[in-house]
């Protein structure tokens, strides 16, 4: 029994403790028949008259050793695991790079000073939470609440809040998305909060016009619930002109203009770039694009009433939405004044979409529609319009929606040197059949869309079913559009013959516009860290059965 007790105490110990621990050395001396301190097995048999006394002595020593070692192990673990405690005031005082940037999440405290400049959303976004809790901002930007983000944050943990300070967050983390509208269940959701979703490819090209309920949705912030009766659009007047405060009824008094326009997110098909190398952004597939018939007042008419005229200097029309984050920062963007004042550019302050008032997800009651330009400039829930000497200072204009070389990473990127995306390049994609589908031999119907920015018309779509060895020209469907005003996509279709012995098809599409711009054949040469402008040949692989 004594031998078992000895082993149960000693064998479980780390080697360093077995040799160096003072309690252990004393035990070995007490149990051993020699004076050596080497950890050899002691004799636990007794033949003299004092054997009972010696037995109890050894047992007591071993039990005492167990208590001492358990306490020693507890002290070691406690010294390693006991976090340092901080008060909310400690955290609050670390709210800038000079004092250090601390934040809290639950009861944990983090020093993120070294991460501020590395934050993918820009230092200014992270600094909003400096000296306080992350919860209100994670509730708003739910993409942060992911295991890999928490793992990254854990590297910066320095301690915990005092128990009395961690009972409740200093700011109520209420749900800013509680009043978001109900969405169509067919939409493929890329982000729930803020809501971002795309229609499934099989529905996307069912018709030339995308139905409102399945029009792709790109939100950056919670959807505001605006009263059309109290809504006002503020238009800053030109020097010598008059600023305007326009109700929805006032906008209806301007000449109504209608135009069919395709909107495409800069991140459409980003998921294909992610397969080459990790990028920052939502994993859009081929559905971050849709087409609608928009109606409203021409922006040039409204600006003219406020006294603005086209001038020689480089000026920009800045838009500000009524959606905002907890600090009151609204979504914003801008376009060149030359485009805004050109009647042929057909820029709208739209209040109708496919003959109906704008849905809430798409900007009710008023949004900007800029034909031929990236969706990021089509500001929704429009609240303010101004003409400035520089483009918008919004984060989404200055620090986002820009393209870079494949060699640029987050350590070398300089957003100030890259121009903001306005017109998008030629684009096409296959919507039918889908990747991995099974088709029958004989004849297969291949369908998709094609579009180019800046009003450039799609003049041809080439399709291959053998991985690019041979090509066939697809039939283009949709409205005929004026030269340089081809604001909407073309739906295309090809019926291809499939030999009975064919086991698979490697289908590719590529489009050409009226400037003879063509799509690049692969993704790697156009990869960029934001995953925007993804317009390589689109490819799907399908299986063929007899």
Curated annotation (Swiss-Prot):
Residues 403-539 are annotated as: Homodimerization. SUPFAM superfamilies: Cytochrome b5-like heme/steroid binding domain, E set domains, Oxidoreductase molybdopterin-binding domain. InterPro entries: Cyt_B5-like_heme/steroid-bd (IPR001199), Cyt_B5-like_heme/steroid_sf (IPR036400), Cyt_B5_heme-BS (IPR018506), Ig_E-set (IPR014756), MoCF_OxRdtse_dimer (IPR005066), Mopterin_OxRdtase_euk (IPR008335), OxRdtase_Mopterin-bd_dom (IPR000572), OxRdtase_Mopterin-bd_sf (IPR036374). Mo-molybdopterin binds at residues 216-220, 265, 323, 362, 367, 378-380. The modification Phosphoserine is found at residue 124. It comes from the Eukaryota. Residues 166-175 are annotated as: Hinge. GO terms for cellular component: mitochondrial intermembrane space; mitochondrion. GO terms for biological process: sulfur compound metabolic process. It catalyses: sulfite + O2 + H2O = sulfate + H2O2. The keyword tRNA-binding does not apply. Catalyzes the oxidation of sulfite to sulfate, the terminal reaction in the oxidative degradation of sulfur-containing amino acids. This is Sulfite oxidase, mitochondrial. It comes from Mus musculus (Mouse). The gene is Suox.
């Amino acid at each position: 029994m004594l031998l078992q007790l000895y082993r149960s105490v000693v064998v479980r110990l780390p080697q360093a403790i077995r040799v160096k621990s003072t309690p252990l050395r004393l035990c070995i001396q007490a149990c051993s028949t020699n004076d050596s301190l080497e950890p050899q097995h002691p004799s636990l048999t007794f033949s003299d008259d004092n054997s009972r006394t010696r037995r109890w002595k050894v047992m007591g020593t071993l039990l005492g050793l167990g208590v001492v070692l358990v306490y020693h192990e507890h002290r070691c673990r406690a010294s390693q695991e006991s976090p340092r405690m901080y008060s909310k005031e400690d955290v609050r005082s670390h709210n800038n790079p000079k004092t250090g940037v601390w934040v809290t999440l639950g009861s944990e405290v983090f020093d993120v000073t070294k991460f501020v400049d590395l934050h993918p959303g820009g230092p200014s976004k992270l600094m909003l939470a400096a000296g306080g809790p992350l919860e209100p901002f994670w509730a708003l930007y739910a993409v942060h609440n992911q295991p890999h983000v928490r793992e990254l944050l854990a590297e910066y943990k320095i301690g915990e809040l005092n128990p009395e300070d961690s009972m409740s967050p200093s700011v109520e983390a209420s749900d800013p998305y509680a009043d978001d509208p109900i969405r169509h269940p067919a939409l493929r959701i890329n982000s729930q909060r803020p809501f971002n979703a795309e229609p499934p490819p099989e529905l996307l090209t069912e018709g030339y016009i995308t139905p409102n309920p399945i029009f792709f949705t790109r939100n950056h912030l919670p959807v505001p619930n605006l009263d059309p009766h109290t809504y006002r659009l503020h238009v800053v007047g030109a020097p010598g002109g008059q600023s305007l405060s326009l109700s929805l009824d006032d906008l209806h008094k301007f000449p109504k203009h209608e135009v069919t326009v395709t909107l495409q997110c800069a991140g459409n098909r980003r998921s294909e770039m992610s397969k080459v190398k990790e990028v920052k952004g939502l994993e859009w597939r081929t559905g971050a694009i849709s087409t609608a018939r928009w109606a409203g007042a021409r922006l040039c008419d409204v600006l003219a009433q406020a006294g603005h005229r086209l001038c020689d200097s480089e000026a920009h029309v800045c838009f500000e939405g009524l959606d905002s984050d907890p600090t009151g920062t609204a979504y914003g963007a801008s376009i060149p004044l030359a485009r805004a004042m050109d009647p042929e550019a057909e820029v709208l302050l739209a209040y109708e979409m496919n003959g109906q008032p704008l849905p809430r997800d798409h900007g009710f009651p008023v949004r900007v529609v800029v034909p031929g330009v990236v969706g990021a400039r089509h500001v929704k829930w429009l609240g303010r319009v101004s003409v400035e000497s520089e483009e918008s200072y919004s984060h989404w204009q200055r620090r986002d929606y820009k393209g870079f070389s494949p060699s640029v990473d987050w350590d070398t990127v300089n957003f100030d040197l890259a121009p903001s995306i306005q017109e998008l390049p030629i684009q096409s994609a296959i919507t039918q059949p889908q990747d991995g589908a099974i088709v029958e031999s004989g004849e297969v119907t291949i369908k998709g869309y094609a579009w180019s920015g800046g009003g450039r018309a799609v003049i041809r779509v080439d399709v291959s079913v053998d991985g690019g060895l041979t090509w066939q020209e697809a039939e283009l469907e949709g409205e005929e559009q004026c030269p340089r005003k081809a604001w909407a996509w073309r739906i295309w279709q090809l019926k291809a013959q499939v030999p009975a012995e064919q086991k698979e098809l490697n289908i590719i599409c590529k489009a050409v516009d009226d400037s003879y711009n063509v799509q690049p054949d692969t993704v790697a040469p156009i990869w960029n860290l934001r995953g925007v402008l993804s317009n390589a040949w689109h490819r799907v692989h399908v299986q063929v059965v007899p």
